[in-house]
């Protein structure tokens, strides 16, 4: 997903979509996938509103609907939620281009209300670490 898409989604997200993304983020540590009912309970929303928000988030590719396991939060959804939170707190006013993509994090330009340039770093916890791959390969030899 491009930075332009993510910036647009930060502006376009409805309150209910943000509540659902926040529920995903809260429950992410304990659950890989979530069903509609658990999201509704955690977000304190009516199930019909949750279904509507999930449909919209899935169309934007911020979550993934598995045919059998329920809904999964993807990196783009977590990134958009983080940018929304930073913008809501007044930390950033806008985002720019991608500065770099590393093995464990992505970094992008941002600007605050005073025009100061900032860098926003997204850690990719699930990304394969080269060090761990090398260690495992050495153990097999």
Feature locations, PLM:
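Alpha-helical DNA-recognition elements
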Residues: 56
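Short amphipathic alpha-helical interface segments
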Residues: 13-42
């Amino acid at each position: 997903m491009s930075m332009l898409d993510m910036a647009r989604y930060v502006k376009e997200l409805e309150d209910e979509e943000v509540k659902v993304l926040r529920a995903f983020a809260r429950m992410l540590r304990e659950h890989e996938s979530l069903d509609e009912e658990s999201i509704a309970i955690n977000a304190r929303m009516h199930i019909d509103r949750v279904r509507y928000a999930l449909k919209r988030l899935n169309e934007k590719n911020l979550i993934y609907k598995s045919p059998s396991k329920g809904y999964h939060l993807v990196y783009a959804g977590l990134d958009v939620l983080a940018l929304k939170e930073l913008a809501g707190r007044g930390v950033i006013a806008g985002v720019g281009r991608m500065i770099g993509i590393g093995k464990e994090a992505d970094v992008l330009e941002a600007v605050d209300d005073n025009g100061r340039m900032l860098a926003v770093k997204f850690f990719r916890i699930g990304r394969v670490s080269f060090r761990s791959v090398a260690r495992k390969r050495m153990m097999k030899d």
